[in-house]
């Protein structure tokens, strides 16, 4: 199939959140399965510092009474063709800035639609989050191009001002809607990034005022778990950690713990229960819950804590103050560093992720991959990726709690701290987590099933068919 990914982010060149990880990784694995997948991305002003971009565009067009140019390159580290939407409105900016994001990304989306109609015509346009929400509306009347819309985080639905209804030729019955709602209504298929989150957003507690619409279209709504690049993030050969290891050489992992304690200024003690967290410091991630119990937890136990992340200034200040109260037992790094995050995954005993809500989550999969036992709240993708430790039946991969309450989190952390004392059971718990399959190839197969379901095609066999055969099947289904 010919598939065009349209998004505001794509790792490693333009990333703010999890959407960038998906758009930067999934196309690579879909191409390995025989599909012609390409990415359409804004030409941000900072991109020339990160990659090679030709000076001359491959195509020029106009949208919303503005001219634009499209430049062709390749996503670094892959063979995925990358089309960059060039216009001055994106050049001097960060990815998200200013109060005109609705106009900028609607203009970008209109440009992507014009590009698909006039230059490279895909079978499917795969749209990501509110920034691309108008594309399914415009493509709804085109029998040759279908759309898939992925909701990465329903909480961000995008602004929408009245004048956009006029210059985008928005149907009268969509007036007043945001672009997220428009995409949900008009896309051929809608998916979220985990099965549990797909169910949760149909309820008032998680639906962000769209639960009625999402329930109405539930027949075309599904959830597919994100993946991680298991070739890049592999404790067996990761050059950023002190000691590589596998499930068979788990005892070697202790060297990473000692190296991490030395690096971040914690007391070097291999027997201390070391908890890590790599996150954005925002309410969604349960930071308010952590702040309510962390002082008590560190006072009650001999545990250590290391945090890596940035976010709300209030949360940053509170974490700094806690670290100053527990020198040698708590380390706070208010930044993001990929290499340090890997050392935290590889060197901590447990990983804390008590999210208020979590569409999918990547960190818990990374922690499992590197043998750090996750402590999570049962919500969204955390339900689908972490199962509660059951020592009697030698089952489970982490410690889970249900209610978003300080006492519930505290109790769960105490159970993990106590479980850490039983080394044979703890190592078996680590091994089960490290053996889980969170590869992007697994996720890619689910997306292929979703794409094929649009055309009523049967599920693809394990050995992917040649692209030409599949393209012929898609063409026949349209005729």
UniProtKB/Swiss-Prot annotation:
InterPro entries: Glyco_trans_1, GS/SS, Starch_synth_cat_dom. Keywords: Glycogen biosynthesis, Glycosyltransferase, Transferase. ADP-alpha-D-glucose binds at residue 15. It catalyses: [(1->4)-alpha-D-glucosyl](n) + ADP-alpha-D-glucose = [(1->4)-alpha-D-glucosyl](n+1) + ADP + H(+). Synthesizes alpha-1,4-glucan chains using ADP-glucose. Belongs to the glycosyltransferase 1 family. Bacterial/plant glycogen synthase subfamily. This is Glycogen synthase. The lineage of its organism: Bacteria, Bacillati, Cyanobacteriota, Cyanophyceae, Nostocales. The gene is glgA.
